[in-house]
Amino acid sequence: MKKAIIASVIALTMGAGVAHAANNANAGTIDLNFSGTVSTTTCALEPEVGGKNGIMGIQLGQTDKNTKGADIEVVFKPTADSATACAAATTDFVMQWDGVGSVFSADGLKASGGAATDSYVLVKATNAKVNNNQQVNADGFQYEFSKDDVISGLKYTMNLMGGAVVGDMTAAAQVKHWYK
């Protein structure tokens, strides 16, 4: 009898667990992306656009079909909290570009959302030691900067390259950075 009661309790518990695990038609989902680095020298950077720091959404403006849009200068500088650590570095600095939800190709960073599906974002460093003035043309593309340029800023020019399809576009990139 004791075994039968225990078996019944286990069966009820398992059944209750299944009921709670069932999908709720009103439930939503949240996708989270996490990234970070572990380093002996921490040098956190933030983008500066139009003289404003910490701009994580870069507005590329409008352009005509099949036309390169205006140059947008983006300068990556140390955050206030890491300026001292960045200045103390003794080696050159690397920035690596990867697409998020899209990929970099010879044409640039392909649109990952919006109606203008054949548009691209063009990205190129303008004060790098290695690959200077070369457009990012593949995931994993790297620029190398002099350690002295980190404090004054790692400079980039970015453009919207319109395709044949009109409309809005979105794209996202992950930029990893470290001292060599």
Which sequence ranges carry the predicted segments?
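Gram-negative bacterial Sec-dependent N-terminal signal peptides
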Residues: 1-22
